[in-house]
């Protein structure tokens, strides 16, 4: 790991002046900080993250409305409130550009005081956030949206595995004595693809127990019974997210579901285990609402809109991240390759029709020995994201 840090010039420490500037930021939220913010502290709010996550940068809030619809809030940490333009911390963040995630560590863009504390949406702590709030029907119709600065107090920190348990059990989970912490924590370390040594399994169990103890300080308590209202929120949001996802693919999104390979290393940085991280419905739930928020904000800025009845002018300049249409030559190569296995695929120039054709090919090849190779070629035919 040290050689990677050296090869790419990754700064694993912050200069004292940057650390001092971050440490000088107050942990307390004052009335001045709350001015102009919508208050969501009494609204049911939670995060869903990997079980070993240390920084929680987004959260969902959920509230049933009297008209039968739901208010769903997508909240992210309001980093810009703490990191002011031109400050020492701002200049350092610009120089770094991004956080870099290695197998055994993270090289953060911001000092720990910000990334893991002030701007981490930890449970039972008031946090300043920027939010996209939607009124949504049970059939995922967007009635209205609002964007602005808020304050939240997360009630619960879910691991993906725990949220997935609720989804898997469906309505039965409402009557079950599901408990946070233990199952979610251990699920991620009990599904190895490859064990590099006989001792790895025992080591994984020991480390999971250590993570479990550490998580007690982050709001995930061993044996903590998950309240019914939280389970209801997860199930309702899962239903809405499923409709949003189906609608997105019908509109031309392409489904790539390659499992991510994860490597576990020991204290000396040596690999001891390789396992698959498979994306499930709990991951899709978060993904769909993040996409909804991003897309809605982009549409609002691009076309102009109304917030609280006041028309906003469309921004003349804004940064969008988009994917161009697939490379036709590479698509032709994919068609030829797939044809060797008996598949036929049209290659229309229209982007949406091409997306439908690609999804059809991937669906037809699903669970076949050649699927992985076809999916890789399909992925390579995609254009890189541009700004």
Feature names for model-found ranges:
Residues 2-387:
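Electropositive polyanion-binding surfaces
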């Amino acid at each position: 790991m040290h050689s990677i840090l050296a090869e790419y010039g990754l700064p694993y420490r912050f200069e004292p002046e940057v650390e001092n500037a971050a440490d000088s930021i107050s942990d307390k939220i004052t009335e001045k900080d709350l001015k102009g913010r919508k208050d969501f502290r009494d609204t049911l709010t939670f995060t869903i993250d990997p079980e070993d996550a240390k920084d929680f940068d987004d959260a969902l809030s959920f509230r049933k409305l009297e008209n039968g619809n739901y208010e769903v809030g997508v909240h992210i940490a309001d980093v810009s409130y703490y990191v002011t333009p031109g400050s020492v911390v701002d200049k350092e963040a610009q120089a770094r550009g991004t956080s870099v995630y290695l197998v055994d560590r993270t090289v953060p863009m911001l000092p720990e005081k910000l990334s893991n504390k002030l701007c981490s949406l930890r449970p039972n702590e008031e946090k300043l956030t920027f939010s996209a709030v939607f009124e949504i029907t049970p059939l995922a119709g967007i009635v209205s949206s609002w964007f602005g600065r808020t304050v939240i107090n997360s009630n619960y920190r879910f691991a993906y595995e725990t949220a997935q348990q609720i989804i898997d059990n469906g309505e039965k989970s409402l009557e079950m004595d599901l408990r946070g912490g233990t199952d979610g924590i251990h699920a991620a370390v009990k599904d190895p693809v490859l064990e590099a040594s006989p001792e790895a399994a025992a080591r994984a169990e020991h480390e999971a127990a250590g993570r479990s103890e550490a998580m007690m300080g982050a709001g995930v308590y061993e044996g903590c019974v998950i309240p019914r209202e939280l389970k209801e929120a997860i199930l309702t949001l899962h239903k809405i997210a499923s409709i949003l996802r189906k609608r997105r693919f019908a509109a031309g999104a392409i489904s790539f579901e390659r499992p991510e390979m994860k490597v576990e290393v020991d204290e000396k940085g040596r690999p001891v285990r390789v396992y698959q991280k498979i994306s499930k419905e709990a991951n899709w739930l978060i993904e769909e609402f993040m996409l909804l928020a991003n897309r809605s904000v982009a549409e609002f800025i691009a076309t102009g809109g109304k917030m609280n009845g006041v028309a906003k002018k469309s921004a003349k300049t804004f940064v969008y991240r988009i994917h161009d249409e697939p490379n036709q030559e590479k698509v032709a190569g994919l068609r030829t390759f797939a044809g060797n296995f008996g598949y036929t695929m049209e290659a229309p120039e229209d982007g949406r029709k091409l997306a439908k054709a690609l999804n059809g090919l991937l669906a037809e090849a699903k669970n076949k020995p050649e699927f992985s190779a076809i999916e890789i070629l399909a992925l390579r035919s995609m254009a890189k994201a541009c700004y």
